[in-house]
Amino acid sequence: MILFNNVNKVWPNGKQVLKNITLEINKGELVAVIGLSGAGKTTLLKTINKINDISSGEIIIDFDKTKDHYEITKTRGKKLQKLRQKIGLMSQEYNNIANKTVLQNVLNARVSSQKGINKIIGFFKREDKLIALNSLNKLNLLDYAYIRADNLSGGQQQRVALARTLAQQPFLIIADEPVSALDPILANQVMKDFKNINKKDGITVIINIHHVDLAKKYATRVIGLNNGEIVFDDVPSKLDAQAMKKIYGE
């Protein structure tokens, strides 16, 4: 569960990008956040793992399986590091190492679980390799395991990035415009991957997305932002012309 209670964010130049954000996101939801560029979508996501600090209000995260409780404004040091290990973060950039194989790229998600010399030299235990291979298998990417990342298409590279995120074994995935650089067919495939992970693994997923049609097709809930405020929060079927006008204006 993620609780935003009257959250505000003001940049040093005085521009307020989040205004009185109050919402609750429950375990197992697939939430699409939509709105114009500059509406506050990316800032909202980056407050969850404290990449962006908030100016006022509170954000509380509870992970049911581990019973870990985080008050974000008070979370720092090792506890913040522990929180970030539980949250998979994706963006429109693939962040793959071009001259490494797909498997090597996915294994990078396991670096934080290594200790001592193993962490320095990049030696991974059998257990970590099985986790990485299982993540590739979930996305039907096993056949690409020993192919270099720079030999893949953009859609395949984004799916490798998703496999790497899965290998992190997160409780929550937040994705910032993960399909913005993809053509419609590949964008649908990646969104379908998110949907399958959400349903089969029970991982909560929050996605910033410009494609309203994809938000309506794959999300269980849509949040619309306009000028830093929540102006829509409902199931996709309620996203009618009136709601779109609130989110995007005339």
From Swiss-Prot:
Binding sites annotated in the UniProt record for ATP: G35, L36, S37, G38, A39, G40, K41, T42
Organism superkingdom: Bacteria
Function (record text): Part of the ABC transporter complex PhnCDE involved in phosphonates import. Responsible for energy coupling to the transport system.
Primary site of residence: membrane
CDD domains associated with the record: ABC_PhnC_transporter
Membrane protein topology class: Peripheral membrane protein
Group of enzyme by EC: translocase
Organism: Mycoplasma capricolum subsp. capricolum (strain California kid / ATCC 27343 / NCTC 10154)
Keywords of this entry: ATP-binding, Cell membrane, Membrane, Nucleotide-binding, Phosphonate transport, Translocase, Transport
Catalyzed reaction equations: phosphonate(out) + ATP + H2O = phosphonate(in) + ADP + phosphate + H(+)
Domain ABC transporter: 2-247
Family statement drawn from the similarity comment of this UniProt entry: Belongs to the ABC transporter superfamily. Phosphonates importer (TC 3.A.1.9.1) family.
GO CC terms: plasma membrane
PANTHER family per the UniProt record, alphabetical: AMINO ACID IMPORT ATP-BINDING PROTEIN, PHOSPHONATES IMPORT ATP-BINDING PROTEIN PHNC
Assembly with partners or alone: The complex is composed of two ATP-binding proteins (PhnC), two transmembrane proteins (PhnE) and a solute-binding protein (PhnD).
Protein's recorded name: Phosphonates import ATP-binding protein PhnC
Name of the gene encoding the protein in the UniProt record: phnC
Compartment annotation: Cell membrane
GO molecular function: ABC-type phosphonate transporter activity; ATP binding; ATP hydrolysis activity
EC number(s) reported in the record: 7.3.2.2
